Amino acid sequence: MAEEGIAAGGVMDVNTALQEVLKTALIHDGLARGIREAAKALDKRQAHLCVLASNCDEPMYVKLVEALCAEHQINLIKVDDNKKLGEWVGLCKIDREGKPRKVVGCSCVVVKDYGKESQAKDVIEEYFKCKK
């Protein structure tokens, strides 16, 4: 997946890098999915990165996640769709053709463990350095 992004443009974009980081963290059991797990991980300062879906329909949910990230200086990145985020973090079934089915929406994901060093992780870290 990452190779496709690199080959096409020479440099990996943030969305592709985010997908790669989430996939690696999922493999290494380093993800907290959903508000309860995410809030616990953020509060214990175990989080390296937090991903929040912009189309979350619960304003208090968004406020809580943003406040915890701000309080503990944890990087927060927003994606536009919770279904897409759910697919990226493995909350779906994969059919025979390799296409995701029965995707469950996920409004918040916290990366507790990146799993391993990768170019995607470096792209994400560089993105946050530029934002500061």
UniProtKB/Swiss-Prot annotation:
The modification N6-succinyllysine is found at residue 129. This is Small ribosomal subunit protein eS12. The lineage of its organism: Eukaryota, Metazoa, Chordata, Craniata, Vertebrata. Signal peptide: none annotated. The keyword Transmembrane helix does not apply. Belongs to the eukaryotic ribosomal protein eS12 family. The gene is RPS12. Keywords: Acetylation, Cytoplasm, Nucleus, Ribonucleoprotein, Ribosomal protein. It comes from Homo sapiens. The modification N-acetylalanine is found at residue 2.
